[in-house]
Amino acid sequence: MPDIEYDNFLKVTLFKLSSEFRRLDTDERAKAKKEFVEVVDTHSERDEIRTYSTVGTRADADFMIVQDSASVDTFHEAAKAINHSLLGRYLDQSHSYLSIRRKSRYKHGGGSPKLKEDYKYMVIYPMTKTRPWYEKSMKERQEMMNDHFRVGKNYPMVKINTSYAFGLDDTEFVLSFEMDDPSEFTSLVM
């Protein structure tokens, strides 16, 4: 078995609020939101949890929760608490990605892949490499990755995190890009 250095697990979940929630009176909505914040805060004591609004950017999601943990079990505990909350009654999970960080097989001078900074925006990019990628030699793949690393170094304002997906979906990797200005991300990838 290869000697692979594993790190924390990453869970990205996108939620859509049902229209019924918007029809609740102001006090009921406030009560549900307050309880939801308490649930997230409780689970943030052990693991890093970040929330991002996607309102106005995605039709199928209103917000995203990104969890970083040493144990997959904590994701289950948090999901159970969210589902049993008042707000949970009005939430549909539109997307979910489960992955683990590990040291890349490709050599580069990058830093730690942990979520450390508190950036304003996060772009999640689930991806799968195609068969032609794996038909290339390791040397060819390393050269292509070196090109990616060179480009990435020109955009230090974008923090890039790579994690390796597993689960029931077809995603192979979950890339996350953190930044304070979304135009920085588009400059990086264009």
Predicted segment positions?
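A short linear hydrophobic-aromatic micro-motif
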Residues: 47-53, 157-164
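Short connector loops at helix/strand junctions that flank enzyme active sites
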Residues: 58-62, 91-93, 120
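Short amphipathic alpha-helical segments
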Residues: 61-63, 123, 171-173
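N-terminal interaction modules that seed assembly of large macromolecular complexes
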Residues: 55-63, 68-69
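Short hydrophobic/aromatic beta-strand micro-patches
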Residues: 14-16, 66-68, 176-178
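Short S/T/G/P-rich N-terminal loop/turn motif that feeds into the first structured element of a domain
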Residues: 1-44, 70-76, 94-154, 166-170, ...
